[in-house]
Design a protein with these regions (language model features):
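Acidic, gly/ser/pro-rich intrinsically disordered tails
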Residues: 1-2, 19-22, 42-44, 103-143
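A broad, low-specificity signal marking well-ordered, structured residues that form hydrophobic/aromatic
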Residues: 29, 49, 95, 141
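Core FKBP-type peptidyl-prolyl cis-trans isomerase
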Residues: 4-46, 91
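Short terminal (N- or C-terminal) low-complexity/amphipathic segments
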Residues: 83, 88-107, 136, 142
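Short, well-ordered turn and helix-capping elements at secondary-structure junctions
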Residues: 13-15, 33-37, 55-57, 81-83, ...
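Beta-rich strand-turn-strand
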Residues: 54-90, 103-104
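OB-fold and OB-like beta-barrel modules that bind single-stranded nucleic acids
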Residues: 5-13, 31, 67-79, 97-100
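Glycine-rich strand-loop-strand elements at beta-sheet edges
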Residues: 35-64
Length: 143
């Protein structure tokens, strides 16, 4: 049996840093991941995936990402059972991140931190860039 997850998406908010009871660093974040297919209205739906990363990598992740950062992660799905403050049994499903990669430049991340994203559109593409690839008829190709 395999429990492997690979996702690419953007952080929905700043990563949250915690310490466990065993004094281990823990970072929680939510990754917005677009689905491959479009809905009936022609829009791509987005899933919001809870993720957690532990240890030294957690601190590196928290210090090098910000809301909107484009990242890739690899890890596993984990189901945790706990009792909340009201004494109710709760379940939490999240991705435990083993590895991550930055999928945008440091300059892009820094410009997002400073709030100066005027040079690009909301998707990180230059203004006026086509949203979809251009369709080219095979008759127009020289080969």
């Amino acid at each position: 049996m395999l429990n492997n997850v690979s996702l690419t998406g953007r952080l929905t908010k700043e990563p949250e840093v915690f310490k466990t009871a065993a004094d281990l660093e823990l970072v929680r974040f939510t990754l917005a991941v677009d689905r491959v297919f479009k809905s009936k209205t022609g829009q791509r739906e987005t899933d919001f995936i809870e993720c957690v990363i532990f240890g030294k990598r957690a601190l590196i992740f928290a210090s090098s990402t910000t809301k909107g950062s484009l990242i890739g992660i690899a890890g596993r799905i984990s189901n945790n059972h706990f009792e909340n403050k009201q004494g109710e049994q709760q379940w939490r499903t999240s991705v435990v991140v083993d590895n991550f990669a930055w999928l945008e430049s440091r300059a892009m991340t820094e410009s997002r931190r400073s709030g100066s994203m005027q040079a690009t559109g909301t998707d990180g593409m230059p203004p006026g860039a086509p949203a979809e690839p251009a369709e080219i008829a095979t008759d127009d190709l020289p080969f």
